[in-house]
Amino acid sequence: MTVRPRPAAAAIIIAAVFGAAAAAAGGGMVGVDGTQFVVEGGRTIYFSGFNAYWLMMMASDPARRAAVVAAFAQASSRGLNLARTWAFSDGGDQPLQSSPGVYDEAMFQGLDFVIAEARRHGIYLLLCLTNNFDDFGGKRQYVRWAADAGHNLTAGDDFFTSSVVKSYYKNHVKAVLTRVNTVTGVAYKDDPTIFAWELMNEPRCDADPTGGMVQAWVEEMAPYVKRVDGGRHLVTAGLEGFYGDGEHESKELNPWGIYYGTNYVATHRAAGVDFATIHLYPDVWLWGSTADEQAAFFRNWTRSHVHDTAAFLGKPLLVTEYGKFLWKGGGANKTQRNYFLDVVLDAIYASASRGGPLVGGAFWQLLLDDDVVAGMDDLRDGYEIILAEDSRAASIIGEHSEQLASLNGQDAEALRRRRRRPASSHRKTRLGSGGDSDALRLPRTLLIRFISLSRSISSFIQDNFVLF
């Protein structure tokens, strides 16, 4: 059964209160003007953000909602104004959608609470609608549902071509976008707290390395989301930035020169796609490489995407995920991680301050100390940033937020005409050795190689041999 709650009269009154608060805090719906994001009156807005995929899951249990409140409060205190999170959980033991069109009301109310809290703290939301990977169901779960219904589907990438699976996805889009928030009384499609819809987290396609299957899927789904939404919110595809084999595709810059089944330029040109995205994980994508090699990759990767976005897309660009693996004995130390943050955030500010297309980003991922709400330690993945535990990282992020906030409110038309000028940057954290001895370097490199190789092998086997 698809749950479609109707707001009571009290909720309608609450909606007016929340609506006024959100308008004051966030400036209303976000639009685009060339390579800039703008709010009402055509004034620019820049995004200093974070990822917290777990928000809906935590909020679905009233006893753990304190984690959501604390996360938004900590983020807001550091000037963060964008949160990227999941608006899906397909199947599994904590589903939002337990089977096609069947929704768990407690989980949906968790998402209601997340949106209401984001409003209260003046933070926009980038809501992702499904996953390329198996975490929280994703495309493979949709294919399983169709196969269980008697359709002859055998691989996860059938998600992109099966008419049945595509109908399931469209139904989910409609269920989410037309949902009326039980806290605020506002339909999601009408809520200015929601910055944009993301079609999928990190779409990839082994079945068609040229990117044609993903391209066709995005060309169908982006306009569909726009129609259901009424064109009020922005839409993006969710790409990591990998190049394909099409025109203006700098495929030689892909990690190891490999195709991932997407086309950065062509897909972001699709009708209904309002802005471009890239991700940045040089230590995973280039496992076993040196810090200098990763730094060179970062510079080329960022420079190329900023250029291509300006030259061939004319749209804004966000780094919607960036992170540095930080696990004792297996990843970078904090000094190296904080240096990485400095470099990424300086690149964002350099572009934004000169009127370029790279106008924001979101680090992966924000967590809280387990003392705040039990269970947080279970979400650690080596990339987490706990602001209360890492004063230097918190300072870097907070300073960057202040820098971007100083650019907010400019006239987008005037910004396009601005002459390019040098931009100030953060104070750099010295990379140094940070205590990373030669004795630890080899085990760390081997672990990162093992993790990356294991993920690749697992993904290949699941896609080609063990769907069910």
Swiss-Prot record:
Originating species: Oryza sativa subsp. japonica (Rice)
Primary residence: secreted
Family: Belongs to the glycosyl hydrolase 5 (cellulase A) family.
Classification via Pfam families: Cellulase
Residues with glycosylation annotation: 152, 300, 333
Region (Disordered) residue spans: 415-436
Tissue expression remark: Expressed in seeds.
Cellular component GO terms held in the UniProt record: extracellular region
Chemical reaction(s) catalysed: Random hydrolysis of (1->4)-beta-D-mannosidic linkages in mannans, galactomannans and glucomannans
Enzyme's top EC category: hydrolase
Name of the protein in its database record: Mannan endo-1,4-beta-mannosidase 3
Composition-biased stretches (Basic residues): 416-430
Active site per UniProt: 202, 321
Residues the record lists as binding substrate: 86, 201, 281, 364, 371
Keywords per UniProt: Glycoprotein, Glycosidase, Hydrolase, Secreted, Signal
